[in-house]
Amino acid sequence: MEDPTLYIVERPLPGYPDAEAPEPSSAGAQAAEEPSGAGSEELIKSDQVNGVLVLSLLDKIIGAVDQIQLTQAQLEERQAEMEGAVQSIQGELSKLGKAHATTSNTVSKLLEKVRKVSVNVKTVRGSLERQAGQIKKLEVNEAELLRRRNFKVMIYQDEVKLPAKLSISKSLKESEALPEKEGEELGEGERPEEDAAALELSSDEAVEVEEVIEESRAERIKRSGLRRVDDFKKAFSKEKMEKTKVRTRENLEKTRLKTKENLEKTRHTLEKRMNKLGTRLVPAERREKLKTSRDKLRKSFTPDHVVYARSKTAVYKVPPFTFHVKKIREGQVEVLKATEMVEVGADDDEGGAERGEAGDLRRGSSPDVHALLEITEESDAVLVDKSDSD
């Protein structure tokens, strides 16, 4: 069997206008010229041609897909760049908005300041206009005064009577008013003489008024200086200083006495309060017991002290019986001194509660020995209790 020769023929695809019809090769021409011997060879050739076409189409598709992927990657890169640019633009816009807000705040503050300044300028302008009007009025008044040549001098003088020469100002007004009226009626030749006389009169009187004013001022200053000197002399004189010293000494003595009295009063009040507190804390019975126990301790610590006879009764309860046992200690009989009656006044009423029971003991002229012994025994018991507690 002969090997069949393969001939690749590229057919133009539909839709490509530049594709030209393939030129038949020499071998293809020979095969076309040859008579078709067998149908199998033609089928094989057509299958091979179709496979080649499919491969070429697949290659083209792969190339197109690669191109599409490249363009897609480029588009993704451009999109990422665009996103970065958009983010940067957004950041710049936010910064711009913040700057705009700050500028708006500053502008509003500036506008408020400008409004305040404008209000102040208006007020200043109004005050300046008022001052200008006042200045104009003053200028007009000054011009009128200069034209009239009338000057009223108001002087304050204390304790000085005004001289009679100052009353000439009224006569000056009348004298100036009369020549003006008469000058209109009289001729032109007489006017200058009267004006000159009036001027001379007014100038002389002004000089006299100034001299009187200067003299009165000098006298007033002199008088005030003399008064001040006299006041200083009186204040710092020896008699005044001695009087002040005596007064200060008297005041110091009074204050010392008052302080002493106050201290005595406070001491008495404090003593009373302390006595009250003592009576509240330690009653009179307890105080007497402590006193007797203290005396007993002192006796016990002194050698060769006198032992007095003493009896003590003890009670023992054994139901249904009670036994009273009396213990008698031998010794000398204690001689007690008779105590006088003590009168309690109104001043001692506050301390009466403290010394109530002590007074009762003092009132007895011949107290019972057994009662005294019982008191001493109770004080011993109190001391024992105190030592146990310590």
Swiss-Prot record:
Residues 22-40 have a biased composition (Low complexity). One of its GO terms (biological process) is rRNA transcription. Residues 136-152, 233-249 are annotated as: Nuclear localization signal. Residues 53-75 are annotated as: Leucine-zipper 1. Residues 257-297 are annotated as: Leucine-zipper 3. Phosphorylated. Present in active and inactive forms. Changes in phosphorylation pattern may alter activity. Phosphorylation at Tyr-156 is essential for its functionin the regulation of ribosomal transcriptional activity. There is a cross-link at residue 161 (Glycyl lysine isopeptide (Lys-Gly) (interchain with G-Cter in SUMO1)). Its main location: membrane. The modification N-acetylmethionine is found at residue 1. The keyword Lipoprotein does not apply. Residues 172-181, 352-365 have a biased composition (Basic and acidic residues). The modification Phosphotyrosine is found at residues 156, 308. Residues 199-282 form a coiled coil. Residues 166-186 are annotated as: Leucine-zipper 2. Residues 52-62 are annotated as: Nuclear export signal. Component of the CAVIN complex composed of CAVIN1, CAVIN2, CAVIN3 and CAVIN4. Homotrimer. Interacts with TTF1. Interacts with RNA polymerase I subunit POLR1A/RPA1. Binds the 3' end of pre-rRNA. Interacts with transcription factor ZNF148. Interacts with LIPE in the adipocyte cytoplasm. Interacts with CAV1 and CAVIN3. Interacts with CAVIN2. Interacts with CAVIN4 and CAV3. Belongs to the CAVIN family. This is Caveolae-associated protein 1. It comes from Homo sapiens (Human).
